[in-house]
Amino acid sequence: MEGITHPIPRTVEEVFSDFRGRRAGLIKALTNDMVKFYQTCDPEKENLCLYGLPNETWEVNLPVEEVPPELPEPALGINFARDGMQEKDWVSLVAVHSDSWLLSVAFYFGARFGFGKNERKRLFQMINELPTIFEVVSGNAKQSKDLSVNNNNSKSKPSGVKSRQSESLSKVAKMSSPPPKEEEEEEDESEDESEDDEQGAVCGACGDNYGTDEFWICCDACEKWFHGKCVKITPAKAEHIKHYKCPTCSNKRARP
């Protein structure tokens, strides 16, 4: 996406400078320029990507046409999930994917120019000194740093990160299969009811029956169940959704 206007970084310092510039551009898109960024990510458009540029700017554009691309590509289709999630959750999801993309670009340069073990380690240490984009946009940058210090001082104390991860995984597990009709009175009865519900569940988009090996998600507005693939929601996206609305319910809300 950047064309030939930006010099190719070749040393650890140059790669880190490139990383820092792209990171600054992405943070700007998700904070100061949030209104413009949100409006640019129109779900009616084709698959869009958020690019951070080395000169601390950003752009939303279609992915490059060349295959394979010159540089690793950022997450594709960020605009599709915009109206199906709360704005805060959507921004957090874009931030997580942006963090992943920044690392892939930095270590792509490292591999391309033959960085050795010590150079890769130094690059990672320099990058790791900076808060992630997700930490910045969620306001957890300072809290995360303090947590890291506390963990280093006392290994016996459990990490808060682990508990948050467990909560997220638990949430996805609950979303992946239809729940029982009501709170169960006894274990045996709850198992029977759960099996009946799963067998009778139908996707609100395609009409197919529930399958145990498929990811499902329920709309909090109409309470219909959908295949994740039918509404373009993955388990990773579901972790960041507090109140999911299907495309139909989202469109109803958008109409004046």
UniProtKB/Swiss-Prot annotation:
Gene3D superfamilies: Zinc/RING finger domain, C3HC4 (zinc finger). It is found in: Nucleus. Residues 146-163 have a biased composition (Low complexity). A zinc finger (PHD-type) spans 200-252. InterPro entries: Alfin (IPR045104), Alfin_N (IPR021998), PHD_AL_plant (IPR044104), Zinc_finger_PHD-type_CS (IPR019786), Znf_FYVE_PHD (IPR011011), Znf_PHD (IPR001965), Znf_PHD-finger (IPR019787), Znf_RING/FYVE/PHD (IPR013083). Residues 144-200 are annotated as: Disordered. The record marks 210, 216, 220, 225 as: Histone H3K4me3 binding. Residues 182-199 have a biased composition (Acidic residues). Ubiquitously expressed. Belongs to the Alfin family. Interacts with H3K4me3 and to a lesser extent with H3K4me2. Histone-binding component that specifically recognizes H3 tails trimethylated on 'Lys-4' (H3K4me3), which mark transcription start sites of virtually all active genes. The PHD-type zinc finger mediates the binding to H3K4me3. This is PHD finger protein ALFIN-LIKE 6. The lineage of its organism: Eukaryota, Viridiplantae, Streptophyta, Embryophyta, Tracheophyta. The gene is AL6.
